[in-house]
């Protein structure tokens, strides 16, 4: 499917290359100024320093290696100025030869900001009595200059700005960026919301290379979102958050893009080696002993970690940046979910209490190798490589107390439940003991050739990224699930208040739940042994060519940039779903008294930590490892769910290929204090989905096949041959912006861009899903249109010396063809008009909303170094942001309000910072009978360090230090639905810098 771009797509690039030939690129009365900017205090070349020729419109920002080039400079004597936040403005006078190049290097010496101090004149350098390098201040200065250089709306944060990140998860770092809220899956920061929007509207790249993501080996609505568990922060120098796009950026990010900039050895002089060893612990298991869980064995809960980095630049010709890390941490995941029936005459009724005890051990490892080689003074070859491994071992253990609403005694209240016994399985106690391993391996290669000579810059690059996620159980020694049921019994539960979780459970009648031999006795419990071993692989192939040229047009400096790009994304899902068996024992009968599951080695292990009495009840639970051993040695004691397992094995594989070809042209210029950007981009999208062409059930029955048999399936799925479904579309995207310097440190910025949101993969290559319990049929929609949007952004930014900022921003996003999931459609519209099997079922299909939907919002960001305070208080700094998102219709998972911030203190030996995030309540599900909400959540983190001389430093970091739970409610805040605790995570380390 990979093909070259059409001739029409290459025209902008050729135009950009040929246009300067008809204009003045370097007049006879002009010359060039070149040089590099270096900071001797940090031993780094300075990126994004502002270099200008006074009295002209000529201004550039230094590159990654600190180099700069000013073209079309009037010949003769000129005044050159260099500005960088937190440092004195430097200037120099030099003579520019006509048609030639003058060279001038600069060194920044010390953070020279003092309240009331005047800038140095000429080449003079202001020197403080004592200068101490502050990683925080230098990191903030880099971020501010990156933001000032950008013509789109961009926020940048250095990776060491918030101290050590527990577990190395980039998501735990990004949650402190303005306008960002993390989506958590239990204890893990999994995906990012920008301006409150769904994670699928944001893209993630490393050095501009789109990272592949296998999205939990699923093909659902989140198949396009990036999951942060597959990336590590170890080799990352800074994170760029672009909330508006330029023509050179991919257009499929209505919310914005995140680019992880890796470290570059050419950005510094000399060699740097760092090594760090650490231990991570949870207060729930603060012991050096091996203790039970996760799984059926014992593990140490205080886990080790290490980080090693090496950087060197050999004579400025060859640069090496190596990073290697590994860490492991233990997390508790304990909670309660209450099922609430709102569709009753007596009001809401709780008819199920689901307690969870899901401890897990997460291990991450990462390797980054970055190589740069200066082939000639004008040509640089580079290779960026990143490898990451993720291993998550988790126990998904649940105990459920259940009854039909009609069997909940009328005397029951929100704090007192009485479940009456029934002569069937309606009132019961369930055990579902799960155990699984999730693995992810991701690799990314990004080669690049960059040629710079005078006014011309050419970049030829490409890349390959592969992400594979797979879930295992049997191969690693256990079943995913073992389900037990105790029926024909009754139970009661009491708690202290309607919003508390301290349920006290009591068995009122029936066989004792403390004896595993009483389970699965009278009422059949089919398919009570399960396994899930699914896998998915995503790959991204990328190639691009960019050209940039500086010229003079109508007396104004103009930069013309154009490029072509092609990206192929593939996603293959090999298998999904749960295969199952019924445990019937040696007697061949599940209901026989001798058919008893093997008990867990450690009785009384289950503890949901909700203030309940479950741990004291000492309830036995099955041992999934021993049950798999029995399955392997005595397979006759397990009866396979043949039809269902065959269905999953043969029909759940799916595949999609998507190729996006793009071409763009972009213009930048400056007139006095105004910088302008204008561009246009064209993208052509082609898709191929490999899926089944399923025959309607009435046709299969009419052909003489019996439902729920394998021959029926084979005929319905056309002998399991998958067919290609093709699709495609083209769009043009405009973008532009302006920055106006109202004063030296006061900027007004306007920015706008058009973008696209492509349909989820499950619509391009999905299958029909039937839910007999809810009587629904979900049908994919391969004809779903892509969403298109227009975004407008306005911002006022004030830069506070030495390295702070205050900004107020507002935005508006207009979306056409907004996609919504599962709207009811007539049965005949999806081919089920004559199928009596689904009479009374509701058919659901994703669709596009008519008209334009609007989302508007505001964001306020503030950070400041409090250097104006006296004495030691000069070491304090503060930061924070507040955001508000307002959609014009009720949408799920939009975060309407969010805030983050913190306070930091640092001096030459000690640093400490306390940070917090807050997000308001949000709707997570809106149904006909019930709306489910997540409560507001406030979390605190802490990090710090103590230097032992100039080489070593003790480090400390804590995540969610107050153990803030994740809580949800149904309809009203007083109807608690879910409460989950994950515990704090603390890391103590020793770092050396050599």
Placement of each model-derived feature along the sequence:
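Short, acidic Ser/Thr/Gly-rich low-complexity loop/linker segments typical of extracellular
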Residues: 56-67, 71
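Periplasmic N-terminal accessory/gating domains of Gram-negative outer-membrane beta-barrel systems
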Residues: 88, 100, 107-109, 114-202, ...
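Short loop/turn motifs that connect adjacent beta-strands in outer-membrane beta-barrel proteins
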Residues: 124-126, 265-271, 314-318, 378, ...
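Transmembrane beta-barrel wall of Gram-negative outer-membrane proteins
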Residues: 296-405, 430, 437-454, 734-737
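Solvent-exposed loop segments that connect transmembrane elements
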Residues: 334-355, 395-433, 478-529, 582-599, ...
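Outer-membrane beta-barrel signature, preferentially recognizing the C-terminal barrel domain
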Residues: 427-444, 648, 652-661, 726-727, ...
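Conserved C-terminal beta-signal and adjacent last beta-strands/turns
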Residues: 529-532, 536, 544-552, 557-561, ...
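Gram-negative outer-membrane beta-barrel transporters
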Residues: 807-815, 819-826, 830-922
């Amino acid at each position: 499917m990979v093909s070259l771009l059409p001739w029409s797509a290459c025209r902008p690039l050729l135009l950009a290359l040929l246009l300067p030939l008809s204009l003045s690129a370097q007049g006879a009365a002009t010359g060039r100024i070149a040089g590099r900017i270096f900071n001797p205090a940090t031993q780094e070349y300075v990126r994004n320093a502002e270099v200008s020729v006074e009295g002209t419109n000529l201004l550039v920002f230094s590159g990654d290696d600190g180099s700069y080039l000013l073209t079309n400079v009037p010949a003769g004597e000129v005044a050159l100025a260099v500005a960088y936040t937190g440092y004195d403005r430097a200037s120099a006078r030099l003579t520019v030869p006509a048609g030639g190049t003058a060279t001038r290097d600069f060194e920044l010496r010390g953070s020279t900001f003092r309240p009331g101090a005047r800038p140095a004149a000429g080449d003079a350098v202001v020197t403080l009595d004592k200068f101490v390098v502050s990683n925080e201040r230098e990191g903030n200065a880099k971020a501010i200059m990156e933001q000032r250089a950008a013509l789109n709306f961009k926020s940048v944060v250095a990776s060491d700005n918030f101290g050590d990140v527990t577990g190395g998860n980039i998501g735990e770092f990004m949650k402190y960026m303005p306008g960002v809220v993390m989506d958590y899956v239990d204890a893990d920061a999994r995906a990012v919301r920008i301006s409150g929007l769904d994670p699928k509207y944001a893209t993630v790249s490393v050095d501009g290379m789109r990272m592949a993501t296998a999205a939990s080996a699923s093909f659902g609505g989140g198949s396009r979102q990036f999951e942060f568990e597959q990336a590590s922060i170890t080799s990352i120098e800074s994170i760029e958050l672009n909330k508006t796009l330029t023509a050179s950026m991919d257009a499929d990010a209505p919310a914005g893009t995140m680019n992880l900039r890796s470290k570059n050895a050419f950005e510094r002089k000399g060699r740097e080696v760092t090594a760090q060893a650490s231990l991570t612990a949870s207060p729930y298991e603060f012991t050096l002993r091996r203790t039970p869980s996760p799984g059926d064995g014992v593990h140490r809960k205080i886990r080790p970690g290490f980080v090693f980095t090496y950087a060197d630049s050999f004579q400025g010709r060859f640069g090496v940046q190596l990073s290697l890390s590994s860490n492991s941490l233990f997390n508790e995941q304990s909670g309660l979910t209450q099922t609430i029936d709102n569709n009753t005459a007596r009001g809401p009724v709780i008819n199920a209490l689901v307690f969870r005890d899901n401890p897990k051990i997460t291990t991450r490892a990462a390797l980054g190798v970055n190589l740069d080689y200066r082939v000639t003074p004008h040509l640089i070859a580079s290779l960026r490589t990143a490898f990451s491994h993720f291993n998550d071992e988790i126990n998904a253990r649940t105990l459920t107390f259940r009854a039909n609403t009609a069997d909940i005694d009328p005397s029951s209240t929100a704090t007192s439940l009485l479940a009456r016994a029934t002569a069937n399985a309606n009132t019961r106690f369930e055990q579902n003991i799960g155990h699984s391993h999730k693995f992810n391996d991701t690799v990314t290669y990004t080669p690049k050739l960059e040629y710079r000579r005078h006014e011309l810059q050419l970049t030829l690059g490409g890349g390959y990224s592969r992400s594979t996620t797979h879930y295992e159980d049997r191969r690693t020694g256990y079943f995913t699930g073992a389900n037990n049921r105790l029926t024909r019994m009754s139970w009661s539960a009491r708690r202290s208040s309607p919003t508390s979780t301290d349920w006290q459970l009591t068995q009122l009648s029936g066989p004792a739940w403390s004896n595993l031999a009483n389970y699965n006795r009278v009422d059949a419990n089919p398919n009570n042994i399960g396994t899930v071993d699914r896998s998915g692989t995503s790959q991204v192939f990328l190639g691009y060519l960019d050209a940039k040229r500086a010229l003079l047009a109508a007396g104004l400096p103009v930069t013309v940039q154009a490029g072509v790009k092609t990206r192929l994304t593939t996603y293959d899902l090999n298998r999904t779903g749960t295969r199952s068996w019924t445990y019937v024992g040696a007697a061949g009968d599940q209901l026989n008294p001798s058919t008893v599951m093997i008990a867990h080695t450690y009785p009384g292990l289950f503890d949901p930590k909700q203030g309940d009495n479950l741990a004291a009840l000492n309830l036995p639970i099955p041992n999934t490892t021993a049950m798999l051993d029995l399955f392997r040695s005595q397979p006759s004691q397990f009866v396979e769910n043949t039809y269902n397992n065959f269905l999953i094995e043969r029909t759940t594989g799916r595949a999609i290929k998507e190729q996006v070809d793009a071409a763009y042209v972009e213009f930048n210029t400056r007139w006095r204090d105004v910088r302008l950007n204008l561009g246009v981009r064209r993208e052509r999208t082609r898709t191929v989905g490999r899926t089944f062409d399923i025959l309607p059930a009435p046709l299969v029955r009419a052909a003489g096949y019996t439902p729920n048999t394998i021959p029926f399936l084979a005929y319905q799925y056309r002998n399991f041959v998958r067919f290609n479904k093709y699709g495609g579309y083209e769009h043009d995207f405009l973008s532009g912006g302006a920055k106006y310097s109202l004063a030296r440190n006061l900027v007004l910025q306007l920015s706008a861009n058009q973008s696209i949101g492509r349909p989820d993969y499950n619509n391009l290559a999905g299958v029909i899903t039937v839910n007999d319990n809810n009587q629904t049929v979900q049908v994919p929609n391969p004809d779903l249109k892509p969403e298109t949007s227009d975004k407008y952004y306005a911002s006022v930014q004030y830069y506070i010396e030495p390295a702070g900022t205050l900004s107020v921003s507002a935005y508006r996003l207009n979306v056409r063809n907004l996609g919504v999931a599962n709207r009811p459609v007539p049965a005949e519209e999806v081919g089920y008009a004559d199928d009596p099997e689904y009479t009374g079922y509701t058919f659901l299909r994703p669709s596009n909303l008519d008209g334009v939907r609007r989302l508007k919002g505001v964001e306020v960001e503030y950070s400041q170094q409090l250097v104006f305070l006296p004495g030691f208080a000069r070491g304090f700094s503060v930061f924070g942001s507040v955001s508000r998102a307002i959609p014009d219709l009720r949408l799920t998972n939009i975060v309407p309000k969010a805030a983050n911030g913190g306070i930091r203190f640092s001096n030459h030996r000690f640093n400490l910072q306390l940070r917090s995030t807050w997000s308001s309540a949000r709707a997570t599900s809106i149904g006909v009978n019930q709306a489910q909400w997540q409560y507001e959540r406030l979390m605190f983190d802490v990090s710090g360090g103590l230097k032992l001389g100039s080489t070593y430093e003790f480090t400390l970091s804590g995540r969610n230090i107050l153990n803030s739970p994740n809580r949800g409610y149904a309809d009203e805040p007083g109807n608690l639905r879910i409460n989950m605790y994950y515990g704090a995570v603390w890391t103590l380390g020793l770092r050396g810098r050599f």
